[in-house]
Amino acid sequence: MSKPKDKERINEKRRAKFKELQKKIGIFFTNEKLLIQAFTHSSYVNEHRRRPHEDNERLEFLGDAVLELTVSQYLFKKFPHMSEGELTKLRAAIVCEPSLVKFANALSFGELVLLGKGEELTGGRTRPALLADVFEAFIGALYLDQGMDAVMQFLGQTIFPKIDEGAFSHVMDFKSQLQELVQRDGIGVLEYSILEEKGPAHNKEFVSRVSLNGQELGIGVGKSKKEAEQHAAQMALQKLKTIGKE
């Protein structure tokens, strides 16, 4: 049985970790109970019935909806030439369990989860479904505490940069989008070329260039020719989008 002083020490450590997280993301909760609830698993509540704990399941429900909306809004604005089907496919890749687990692990969310002893013993702290749920619950808690702007600020640190870096390019067909745009506006002919191949056979890197009527539009790097061309097309789309705004 834990002594009161031991419990106090554990609580102090936990509070310090929550403060550390808030400092790391630059967002401080007004209602810290919401923050703690986001990390409270139902197994912990079941084992601490004497204390008024609430689990994170309702927050997860809310966070799931908020995440879908914010990611949808970001994609809608960032990729004006992407079809509804392509946007849906990309959003699904971003908010799927494996992606959410990566985002949660990047912030060491697993260390903060309040778990029941049984769940702890069976490795619940590293269970993908649990980590994905906690990430969604955190979004829900942040939305309730500070609103949509704070959620967008948080996603601007965790998810949106990954989209910009091309982490989900495997589900995005930038070449088709670029081809469609060029054909629609009748602005010329696209041509792809491999500028460079470097690295050993097992870890090659390709540099691709896409040109429009002989003029360079974008350069991309990838582990395969196809990936390099996709990244080059992505850069070209961004360039054409910027020109279109001028």
From Swiss-Prot:
Its cofactor is Mg(2+). It is found in: Cytoplasm. SUPFAM superfamilies: dsRNA-binding domain-like, RNase III domain-like. Homodimer. It comes from the Bacteria. Residues 173-242 form the DRBM domain. InterPro entries: dsRBD_dom, RNase_III, RNase_III_dom, RNase_III_sf. It catalyses: Endonucleolytic cleavage to 5'-phosphomonoester. Residues 18-147 form the RNase III domain. The gene is rnc. The keyword tRNA processing applies. Belongs to the ribonuclease III family. NCBIfam families: RNaseIII. Pfam families: dsrm, Ribonucleas_3_3. GO terms for biological process: mRNA processing; regulation of gene expression; rRNA processing; tRNA processing. It comes from Geobacillus sp. (strain WCH70). The keyword Lyase does not apply. GO terms for molecular function: double-stranded RNA binding; metal ion binding; ribonuclease III activity; rRNA binding. HAMAP family: RNase_III. This is Ribonuclease 3.
